[in-house]
């Protein structure tokens, strides 16, 4: 493999670095200021590629840097914590999601509604609710995440993170998205898989 202009295997790179985290690692951190205040993020580093996972935004992928170059688009709203979103207070017509949509490398849409705002017949189990208004984008990217696994294995040269995102409401849906992101040392790619229950 070739990394930062140097050819070699994992053992060679181990000798060239004082700590494996220089080229292979994963850190959980939290933003302390501005619109992102309180947002937890995972920064995953694998040689020449680095990704930033927005833990409290449905485990979406915010930034992806390849050789230090950003590959994502960021909306004019910028990166924001989901708690800044109040759809009924900001945009009563259902488009308020766009005020907090950060763009990024991957924004999860749905998982039970995609497209623009609309009203649907009741699917709640509560007799007092006769219709439901769905807003643009759905709820999942506004949902916090439970991190199930973070495994950085220098011996195998792998990184794997698994998280669960739950979208639920009383008398309504209870959906769980399990997202896995994995990388192999020295490869400039990552794999993402989703499973919905």
Language model features with spans:
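Surface-exposed acidic/polar loop and edge beta-strand patches at domain peripheries
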Residues: 1-191
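A conserved active-site cap/scaffold subdomain adjacent to cofactor or substrate pockets
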Residues: 193-197
């Amino acid at each position: 493999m070739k990394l930062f202009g140097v050819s070699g295997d994992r053992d060679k790179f181990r000798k060239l670095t004082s700590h494996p985290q220089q080229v292979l690692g994963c850190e959980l951190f939290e933003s302390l200021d501005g619109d992102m205040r309180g947002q937890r993020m995972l920064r995953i580093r694998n040689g020449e590629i680095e990704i930033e996972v927005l833990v409290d935004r449905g485990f979406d992928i915010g930034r992806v840097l390849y050789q230090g170059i950003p590959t994502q688009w960021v909306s004019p709203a910028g990166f924001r914590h989901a708690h800044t979103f109040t759809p009924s207070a900001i945009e009563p017509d259902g488009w308020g999601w766009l005020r907090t949509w950060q763009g990024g490398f991957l924004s999860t849409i749905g998982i039970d509604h995609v497209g623009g705002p609309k009203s649907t017949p009741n699917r709640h189990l509560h007799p007092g609710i006769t219709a439901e208004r769905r807003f643009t984008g759905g709820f999942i990217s506004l949902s916090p995440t439970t991190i199930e696994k973070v495994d950085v294995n220098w011996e195998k040269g792998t990184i794997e993170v698994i998280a669960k995102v739950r979208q639920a409401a009383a008398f309504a849906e209870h959906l769980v998205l399990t997202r896995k992101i994995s990388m192999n040392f020295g490869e400039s790619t990552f794999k993402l898989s989703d499973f919905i229950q």
